[in-house]
Amino acid sequence: MSVVASGRVAANLQRLGIKLPAAAAPATNYVSYVCSGMQLHVSGQLPKNDVGGCMTGQLGASLTVTEGQAAARACALQVVSQMQAALGDLDRVKRVVKLNVFVNSSPSFTEQSYVANGASDLILSVFGEEVGRHARCAVGVAQLPFGAAVEVDALVELNN
């Protein structure tokens, strides 16, 4: 099931040929997002493939940078779906403040920042330069939940 959106950001999604997936339910004991004041915190999102399974593997071992970028992009799509679920209108996003990108990495893999570009590029395409340009942290980790290749969370500033 895909999400229906309206407004400027929805027009960008349509122009880009992107259909948001349904926002994923939390896998364990947490919530998918928290609105606090003028901030939205989106919990870590895993990369879903076209059939709803998790994109798994380790960068530098079983996955290439290009495959990692695709996984990061899939995570970012889930982040945007959570924003839509939380806000109802993606035009309420004033600024994507920060993305944290966790990359399942072999000990010798050092290209986490290139993998994270998959998420950053998607956010910039959807929200545009003024709203979508964000700070970012790209971190290599030994493992992620369910063997996921990448996990992305976000901090978003909201309009009134």
UniProtKB/Swiss-Prot annotation:
Gene Ontology cellular-component annotations: cytoplasm
PANTHER family, per the entry: ENDORIBONUCLEASE L-PSP_CHORISMATE MUTASE-LIKE DOMAIN-CONTAINING PROTEIN, ENDORIBONUCLEASE-RELATED
Annotated keywords: Cytoplasm
Locations listed in the record: Cytoplasm
InterPro entries documented for this protein: Endoribo_LPSP/chorism_mut-like (IPR013813), RutC-like_sf (IPR035959)
Keyword Cytoplasm: yes
Protein name: Protein TCP17
Species, as recorded: Trypanosoma cruzi
